[in-house]
């Protein structure tokens, strides 16, 4: 993704895709943590769909410029989860990428059933959102340092 060679008709849908997906992704982490009993995201003001609480300005700009970026991570305290099972933290970690997959499927439905016809670059919101969400899900599942995949990779079953 090179922001300097993109028309406004393509840039605006990408910005919308970025805002929607990063916000929903981080909200999903916060919601799942609260469901498992950790009130840290609520106390930090992260249990909201307000994009200003979730978007990191530098990470968002980097995502637009080079295709790799980040949002503000949701604080989660694994010691306050009601279930001390390793799957609880794994569920919190996987809720973000799962939310990206759900958003990708939801945006693909109108395209699949021809409810929305993309015409040139002026109607590129849904294809851009779909591609962005799948890419974002892939990046989050990679087992790199400080990524979601690493948290899940080292969790062991209790048996």
Language model regions located:
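Hydrophobic transmembrane alpha-helices and their immediate loop junctions
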Residues: 1-155
């Amino acid at each position: 993704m090179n922001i300097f060679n993109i028309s406004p008709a393509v840039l605006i849908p990408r910005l919308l895709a970025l805002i929607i997906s990063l916000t929903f992704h981080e909200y999903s982490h916060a919601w799942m943590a609260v469901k498992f009993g950790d009130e840290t995201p609520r106390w930090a003001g992260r249990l909201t769909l307000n994009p200003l609480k979730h978007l990191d300005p530098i990470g968002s700009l980097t995502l637009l410029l080079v295709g790799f970026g980040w949002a503000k991570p949701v604080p989660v305290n694994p010691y306050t989860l009601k279930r001390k099972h390793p799957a609880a933290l794994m569920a919190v970690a996987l809720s973000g990428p799962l939310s990206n997959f759900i958003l990708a499927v939801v945006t693909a439905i109108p395209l699949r059933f021809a409810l929305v016809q993309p015409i040139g670059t002026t109607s590129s919101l849904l294809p851009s959102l779909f591609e962005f969400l799948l890419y974002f899900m892939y990046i989050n599942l990679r087992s790199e340092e400080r990524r979601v995949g690493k948290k899940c990779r080292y969790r062991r079953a209790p048996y």
